[in-house]
Regions:
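Glycine/serine-rich anion-binding loops at beta->alpha junctions
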Residues: 80-96, 130-136
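ATP/NTP phosphate-donor binding region
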Residues: 1-82
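Structural motif
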Residues: 3, 25-27, 54, 81-84, ...
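A glycine/threonine-rich phosphate-anchoring loop and its flanking beta-alpha core
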Residues: 103-200
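Short Gly/Thr/Asp-enriched flexible loops that form oxyanion-binding sites at enzyme active sites
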Residues: 72, 91-105, 138-141
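Active-site nucleophile and cofactor-binding loops and adjacent substrate-binding regions
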Residues: 60, 86-88, 248-252
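Active-site segments that bind and position negatively charged phosphate/pyrophosphate groups
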Residues: 192-255
Length: 255
């Protein structure tokens, strides 16, 4: 089960979970600019200053299979024990893909296409979202593109061990980014609510997400958006992710 640490400034509490990464080799998966822009880099630089950290950001938005191959090769060469993803949906997907393929990179493409069971690499996954949209930190799915085809991996092994939801980290996103991300969360909540696979629990999560979107989405688009609103949208995205994690996606999600 994923442990969620939620609150404004919560990333600074990572130090309280040092047992998860102390004296271990950490693969830090990040975006090229968002890691610094969000303020996460400055916080983690202090917390992880004495740790053995290897950063990987050599991949595109909506990761391609070739990107994942490079990530796995980098992680295996570093002999990592922990994966820490700091970023949006593509960053989190990349971290999940590296974990999924870590033990069996030679057969990774076949695993994706055949939906084979994944081997457990015994690597912890810590996730810090810096966008409020995909809810990927709450799901057991990862998306990868092979050529022009979009594939989805699904395994309980892809659920993070620990997630930090910190509204401060999305404060530097542009209004356009926040609008796109917010509509992503809203759409996922609606999709989950009417999905054939919905349950009483998933519907509860979906409606929590919808209520938070209604309350906070207009507010986060303002230049002086308060942390409360930013954090509210981060929680909305997480609830939408928890909902879709249960109900699964519908045809609309293929685009």
């Amino acid at each position: 089960m994923t442990k969620i640490i939620s609150g404004i400034g919560s990333l600074e509490k990572l130090i309280d979970f040092k047992d998860q990464f102390f004296d271990k080799r950490i693969l830090l998966v990040t975006g090229k600019g968002s890691f610094s822009n969000s303020g996460a880099e400055l916080i983690l630089k202090n917390i992880l200053r004495n740790e053995c950290v290897f950063r990987f950001s050599d991949f595109e938005v909506n990761p391609k299979f070739e990107d994942a191959e490079r990530g796995v090769a980098f992680a295996r060469e570093a002999n990592i024990d922990v994966i820490m993803a700091v970023g949006g949906g593509s960053v989190i997907d990349m971290a999940k893909l590296i974990k999924a393929f870590y033990l069996n990179p030679e057969n990774a493409q076949a695993m994706v296409k055949s939906k084979a069971c994944l081997l457990d690499p015994k690597v912890s996954l810590i996730v810090v979202p810096t966008t409020a949209g995909s809810g990927s930190e709450a799901t057991h799915f990862a998306v990868v593109h092979i050529g022009k085809e979009k594939y989805s991996l699904a395994s309980p092994l892809l659920l993070p061990n620990t997630v930090f939801l910190d509204g401060k980290l999305i404060s530097t996103c542009s209004a356009y980014q926040k609008a796109c991300n917010g509509l992503d969360a809203l759409a996922q909540a609606i999709e989950s609510a009417w999905a054939v696979g919905s349950t009483e629990v998933s519907i509860k999560y979906a409606f929590k997400a919808l209520k938070l979107c209604k309350k906070y989405l207009p507010k986060v688009l303002k230049d002086d958006a308060e942390y409360e609103a930013l954090h509210g949208m981060l929680e909305a995205a997480n609830f939408a992710g928890q909902a879709i994690n249960i109900s699964k996606t519908t045809a609309a999600h293929a685009w």
